[in-house]
Amino acid sequence: ETYKNIFWWLAFSKPRGVLGKKFNPVDHPEIYKAISPIYNIPDVSQRKLPPQLLTSATKDRISPVKMIKQYANALKDKNQEFEYWEHLNRNHAYLDSGKTIYAGNDFKKDGIPALKVMMNFFDKHL
């Protein structure tokens, strides 16, 4: 994370890694690799993971489509079950309630289609 992400400014906070200031990805890559899902996918012959639904928004610059597809390819390489869905012409935070002026999202227009995809996934797998 960097200061380029406006949400740090809006929260009056500073960018940090998921493990705080002491352990950052540059100085401790082995720790981040150990907890990163993409590096810890077992082959289906070793352990079958539950089906996963991966969603992305084509205008998302925080969690870009490319990153989600990398994870999808890693699951595919290990023969794990997943479904992938792209929310076309949408930005990050399309599931936020109400309207998000910064992202240009409106829950009624953007969230409902995503929830339908999620509910269909749950109906199929639960």
Locate predicted features.
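A generic structural signal for short
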Residues: G17, K59-R61, F107
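Solvent-exposed loop/turn segments at secondary-structure junctions
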Residues: E1-K4, K59-R61, N89-A93
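Mobile cap/lid helix-loop segments that gate and shape the active-site cleft of serine hydrolases
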Residues: E1-D43
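Conserved alpha/beta-hydrolase "acid-adjacent" motif
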Residues: R61-Q70
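Short beta-strand/loop motif that positions the catalytic acidic residue
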Residues: R47-K48, L53-S56, D60
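Short glycine-/acidic-enriched loop or helix-start segments at secondary-structure transitions
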Residues: I6, P64-V65, D96
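C-terminal catalytic histidine-bearing segment of alpha/beta-hydrolase fold enzymes
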Residues: L53-T55, K69, N73-L126
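Conserved serine/cysteine hydrolase catalytic core
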Residues: Y39-L49, K66
